[in-house]
């Protein structure tokens, strides 16, 4: 791959906070991307990691994202519903309309629901109180253990464990793995209460990966891909930011004090799980920049 490095923004929807899911808790993701090199030894990615500046007023970067030099943004919606202002959403939407790539991810119930106001990709994210899934059968509690969290809360497993995912045919470029017998990636980190994503019927989007609840056996969507076109850049809607968090890659990195669920350790015992996760990250980062 030739040319300048792909400029990636890793961004949360909260201010820098020690005891929360601020950008410091995605350091392994950032370092992995920074360490990728082209065949000539040059950096493949130029990575910027940041939290939002203030709460309740437009962020100087997000509100003018379309005027930035970034090729793509990974947005971790870790807020309780107020993480993006109208000006932020407008700037992000303009960024995608001018061809920028977006990965937008959230978590259970209403965590990250400020992304509902993003043009196009916001429609892929269903929450408890906003943009509810039109399929009423999906509005049901899946994880019964953390009773303070209601639907959507798909239980793919414990933090620290991994899940086997299903690539939906045809295999999307972000899920391809030439070393896999099936040609597709198999593993991603688990989380006890993942969010709900689906493909809006009025857009060029489709579900590309699904998982299975370890509690109910229900299938749930993990990722939705929006193909680039003349009106918008490529995008991925992801069911939970925990697929990319330090804690879910390496338990030793710790988590905020409010995380109460007992973790597993399968990620540490099965190297292939992290290899697949990092391959997914690399595939997504290249696809969002249209370099896949």
Predicted regions and their residues:
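Lipid deacylating catalytic domains
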Residues: 61-66, 211-219, 223-229, 234, ...
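Structural motif
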Residues: 71-76, 103, 235-237
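A glycine-rich, often tryptophan-bearing local segment used as a flexible ligand/cofactor-contacting loop or short
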Residues: 11, 80-180
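Short, solvent-exposed loop/turn segments at secondary-structure junctions
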Residues: 15-16, 79-80, 109-111, 214, ...
